[in-house]
Amino acid sequence: MLVLVINSGSSSLKYQLRELADDGADGPRPVLAKGLVERIGVPGSDVPDHAAALERVEAEVFRVIGDRPIDAAGHRVVHGGERFTAAALVTNEVIRAIERLAPLAPLHNPAAAQGLRAMTERYPDMPQVVVFDTSFHQTMPREAWQYALPESVYREHGIRRYGFHGTSHDLVAGMAARHLGVAREEFSGIVLHLGNGASATAIRDGASVDTSMGFTPLAGLVMGTRTGDLDPSVVTHLMRTQGRSAEEMDTLMNKESGLLGLAGHADMRQVVEAADAGDRRARTALDVASYRLAKYVGGYHVAVGGAQAIVFTAGIGENSAPFRARVVQRLGALGVELDAAANEAGLSGAGDDGVAVISAPGSAIPVLVIPTDEEQAIARLTWELTRG
């Protein structure tokens, strides 16, 4: 089965063509084609809209597969609000619902809807599926998602914690459960999705019960350019005393902070290199980021009733042995012990199931490194919803 995975941005369209076994068997499947169409709708661009972008995708894809038909398309959508608790088959009403959720994700949902409409017009008979970053976290109990604001703020404006990276957390939790030999619905653990954007999720009995991101992906951990958790009064203080606008504060917190603000580098590799060379700012950035993450791990160990595993995934989680070590070294109170050699080996020391164990044999909680593959997860969900 050929599945085209689409991630539509406001001025870009990222795609992968994945081939799945007809029986939906698990396991890595080949990426037949992938690419990125940029500058959509930008003045002077030769790609005026998402329909034109799809023409480019089509040309590249069919250069690879010839006259083989694409069986289905799966779309990543950032925000599903409270309506979408799982992936859904695309209909006009689903697209309209995504558009109505635009106030919760003004940069992402309108672009996703444009991509969906362009795809539907070009391939009206092709089954399509939408997969939401937020859906996995809709199992959070109210005490985890509700802010201590007046109830009317939630009812009238939808202000609550939603969480993101759900597709990745869901996929990796399933792989961790299989590695441990427990049923998915019996797995309780902590998944750390650490990339330029980063989030931690507490999983109890296979379901998300808490996650570090909140109303937006700004909350939680220290990220490449995002603050993570911040006293909201800092925002009003800077607006009052410096005359900063809401847009300027958005830029400061989302694009100029995090590792970039602390160390001058948004890339974890550069921060680690600078710290090793004696850069004080870089060392401070690593201390702040690892301390923040370790606090979340400790809290989520309580939230899940005792974690069966702590899992690192995504770009930093999979590839930065120095940062993993800094985090795990802070977890001694939980009885967690690192195997330094296994940590250095990382995924090169993974077993046949693709999972690397980086904790020492005597560690109270296994520490795992598991590669995420959100496009593969979207492709598989697309297969599941369209096979019948």
Swiss-Prot record:
It catalyses: acetate + ATP = acetyl phosphate + ADP. Its EC number is 2.7.2.1. It is an enzyme of class 2 (transferase). GO terms for molecular function: acetate kinase activity; ATP binding; magnesium ion binding. One of its GO terms (biological process) is acetate metabolic process. Its cofactor is Mg(2+); Mn(2+). GO terms for cellular component: cytoplasm. It comes from the Bacteria. Substrate binds at residue 76. Mg(2+). Can also accept Mn(2+). ATP binds at residues 14, 193-197, 267-269, 315-319. Transmembrane segments: none annotated. The keyword Transmembrane helix does not apply. The record marks 165, 226 as: Transition state stabilizer. This is Acetate kinase. The active site is at residue 133. Pfam families: Acetate_kinase. The keyword ATP-binding applies. Keywords: ATP-binding, Cytoplasm, Kinase, Magnesium, Metal-binding, Nucleotide-binding, Transferase. Homodimer. Pathway: Metabolic intermediate biosynthesis; acetyl-CoA biosynthesis; acetyl-CoA from acetate: step 1/2. Mg(2+) binds at residues 7, 374. Belongs to the acetokinase family. Catalyzes the formation of acetyl phosphate from acetate and ATP. Can also catalyze the reverse reaction.
